[in-house]
Amino acid sequence: EQDLDFELGSVLVSNTFGAQLRNNTIDGVGLRSTREREFLADIRFDSVDQSSVSTYWQSEAQWTQSLRSTTSLRYDRFDFDVTSLAAADPTTLAANSGRKNDSVVSGSLGLIYTVDDSLELYANIGQGFHSNDARGVISRLDPVSGEAIDAADPLVKTLGSEIGARLFLTERLNASLVLWQLDIDSELLFVGDAGNTEDTGVGSERHGLELTGYYQIGNSWSVDLEYANANSRFETPIDGFDDIPGALEHVVSGGIGFQRGDGFHGYLRLRHFGDYNLDGGVDAEGSTLLNARLGYAFNDRLSITVDALNMLDSNDRDIQYFYESQLRGEPAPVEDRHFHVFEPRAIRAYLEYTF
C-alpha cells in the first residue's frame, strides 16, 4: 500500500494505492449423512482452491472546512478450482469438477458534511460484488439426483447507496441514523439435502434503516443499543412470492459493559432476531440470545476471561431452513422446517499471555 498526497489549488487530496493477494485451500468440505453423529455416507465432498488478486485506489479531498469527499476504484479477479471427491451419485464427479475465473471493476463516491461539532451528514453510493460458493460456480449436475443444474455466476455485482447522520449530543452520548438501499444482480438459494446452491436467476432489492446509540456512564460503564430493519424482495416473484428466504427483517442488539482501571472488565449482551421468511408463506420463529463476559488483566501481558454463553439456556432456533426430506417410516418426502437450536448454556474460561 502506498500513500500519495498533493494539492489541487487550495484543496488537499490524499490518495492511497494498494494491492491484495489471497488464497484459500480446503482439502475437504462437504455434506454428509449421519445418525447420532455417526458417519453414514457422503452427499457431496469436495476439495476447493480459491485465489484472488485485487488492486485499488482511494482518494479523499477536503474541499472546504465542512465538506470533504471520498472516491475509490477497485479491480478484483477470482480463480476457482474444485475437485469433486465423493457424491451420492458418483457419476456426477467429473461434471462437478473444474476451473473457472471472473473479474469485476467497482467504484464508489461519498460526501461528508460537518454541520457543527454535534452533527455530521453523509451520503454514499457505490458498486460492489459478492463471490459465490466455488462448488456452486463449478457444479453442473445435482450430486444426489444427477439432474442438470445451472451453475452460479462466480461474481455477482451489487449497487448500494445510503444517507445518514451522526449526532454527538454530549461528550458521553452519541447516536447515528442511516437509510440505505442495496440492489443485487442475482440471488442464490441453499438446497440443504443436496449440499449445493441454486441460482434463482432473479435479482433482489433491499432497503432499510439502522439506528445506534451509545452512552458512557461515568468513567467505567457504557451502554449501547442498535436496531436494524431491512425489507428484502426479489425483483420478480418466484412461485408467486417475492420474499427472500433467510433475509432478516428486524434485528435488535444491546449491552452494558465496564472497563475498570484495576484490571476488571466485562459485558452483558442481548441479541434478538425477529421472525423471518423461510420459503413462500412459511416463516421462521425469532430468537433471543444472552451472553456475558467477565475478565481480569493482571498486567499488560497476562489476563483471564470467563464467558457465559446462552445464559438463559434458550432453546430458540439458531439456524433454520425449509426444504423437502424423508425420515425412516415416511412413505414420501415431506416439506418441513429443519433447524438447529442454540448450544446449551456453557461456561468457557481463557488464559491469555502476550509475548
Please provide the spans of the model-predicted regions.
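Repeated loop/turn-to-beta-strand initiation elements of outer-membrane beta-barrel proteins
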Residues: 10-12, 66-69, 118-121, 171-175, ...
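Face-selective signature of the C-terminal outer-membrane beta-barrel domain
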Residues: 1-87, 112-114, 176, 224
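C-terminal beta-signal and adjacent terminal beta-strands/loops
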Residues: 223, 296-355
